[in-house]
Amino acid sequence: MDGTFLDHLGAYDKARLDNLLDACEAKDYVFTVASGRALLALEELFDGFVDRIAIIAENGALVQYKGEVLFESKLEPKDYLQIADTTLSLPTCEGILLSGRRGAYAPNDADPAYLKAMERYYENVMATDLEAVTDDIFKVTAKFQGDTIMERGDYLNTIFEDMTAVTTGFDSMDIILKGV
């Protein structure tokens, strides 16, 4: 959505969207937002419109229509903890985040600057003991030094056969269940 639907400030014309939704509804079209962002962040961004749109969040791991969850693909704790440990051990990894239904979780020792930067894309960002997380987790996001991201993605795709690492288009990678 950055650089397409959203302007350089990360905003959009709400009156224009309202008019567009009226036109879509008149033709029985469904306006759908598709993003790698978390559902909470998208609900916040589209506040006032959630009951009129479909949202495909978390790179497809969570689908909601008019506020009702239609599909979700959650990671098991053993899987996201293994992904987190492996990813954090890579020399060019600058931070990881577990993206959940109620918030986003980074390790206790996460760089505060990384947490602050992630607040642009996630709601309720917090540093915590990842083993104590009880939220539903849909993906693991990892930030890498820019020139190593493709190499790291290939590596992660090799060692986690049931997962897929996809670039976010910037210097981060989302790791989700394969087939999502």
Predicted regions located by residue number:
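Asp-based phosphoryl-transfer active-site loop
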Residues: 1-11, 33-35
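A short, flexible beta-alpha/helix-coil linker loop
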Residues: 4-5, 62-63, 171-173
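A short local structural element in Rossmann-fold oxidoreductases
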Residues: 6, 43, 153
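Short, contiguous strand/loop micro-motifs
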Residues: 6-8, 29, 70-71, 139
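Glycine- and other small-residue-rich loops at beta-strand/loop junctions that grip anionic moieties
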Residues: 9, 34, 72, 175-178
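Short beta->alpha junction loops/turns
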Residues: 10, 76, 145-146
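Active-site phosphate-binding/coordination module
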Residues: 14-113
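Conserved acidic, metal-coordinating active-site core of Asp-based
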Residues: 93-180
